[in-house]
């Protein structure tokens, strides 16, 4: 798939999103900062990427997801948990960055912060019914299928 990308900050020309390995699902996104950014515990900030994308095809969307090491090692996760980029969005990709940890964290310019995953989208239409056909699960939820 070819993805239209607009470089909003000239430094990003040399730091385009990239797959770390041939098996990677996500493209690494970097913090397009001019100086280190200190996040205090509990603080959330929007971090620019210096890039914009346009998927154009309503059959696709992009997800901004955390990098596992940032969350596990440093407590740095996404403030919105998952960023959803619709196919018709054309603005700068911003990363809602939340320090859920207990210590201060410093994010450096051009540090890999999140990942972008392109996913297929199915737009549903509704079929209004009075009752559903019976299923094995029914209305059971929130642990109703057991612990293990």
UniProtKB/Swiss-Prot annotation:
EC number(s) on file: 3.6.1.23
Binding positions (substrate): 67-69, 80, 84-86, 94
Gene Ontology process terms (BP): dUMP biosynthetic process; dUTP catabolic process
Residues forming coiled coils: none
Chemical reaction(s) catalysed: dUTP + H2O = dUMP + diphosphate + H(+)
The protein's annotated pathway: Pyrimidine metabolism; dUMP biosynthesis; dUMP from dCTP (dUTP route): step 2/2
Matches recorded under Pfam families: dUTPase (PF00692)
Cofactor(s) needed for function: Mg(2+)
Record keywords, A-Z: Hydrolase, Magnesium, Metal-binding, Nucleotide metabolism
CDD domains in the cross-refs: trimeric_dUTPase
GO molecular-function terms, A-Z: dUTP diphosphatase activity; magnesium ion binding
Family to which the UniProt record says this protein belongs: Belongs to the dUTPase family.
NCBIfam families with a match to the protein in the record: dut, PRK00601.1
Function description: This enzyme is involved in nucleotide metabolism: it produces dUMP, the immediate precursor of thymidine nucleotides and it decreases the intracellular concentration of dUTP so that uracil cannot be incorporated into DNA.
Protein name: Deoxyuridine 5'-triphosphate nucleotidohydrolase
Native organism: Paraburkholderia phymatum (strain DSM 17167 / CIP 108236 / LMG 21445 / STM815)
């Amino acid at each position: 798939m070819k993805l239209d990308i607009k470089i909003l900050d000239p430094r990003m020309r040399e730091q385009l999103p990239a797959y770390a390995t041939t098996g990677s699902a996500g493209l690494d996104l970097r913090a397009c900062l001019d100086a280190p950014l200190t996040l205090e515990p509990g603080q959330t900030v929007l971090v620019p990427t210096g890039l914009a994308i346009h998927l154009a095809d309503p059959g696709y969307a992009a997800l901004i997801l955390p990098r596992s090491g940032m969350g596990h090692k440093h407590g740095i996760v996404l403030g919105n948990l998952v960023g959803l980029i619709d196919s018709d969005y054309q603005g700068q990709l911003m990363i809602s960055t939340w320090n859920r940890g207990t210590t201060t964290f410093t994010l450096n310019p051009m540090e890999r912060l999140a990942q972008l995953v392109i996913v297929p989208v199915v737009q549903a239409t509704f079929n209004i019914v009075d009752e559903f056909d019976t299923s094995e699960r029914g209305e059971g939820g929130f642990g109703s299928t057991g612990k293990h």
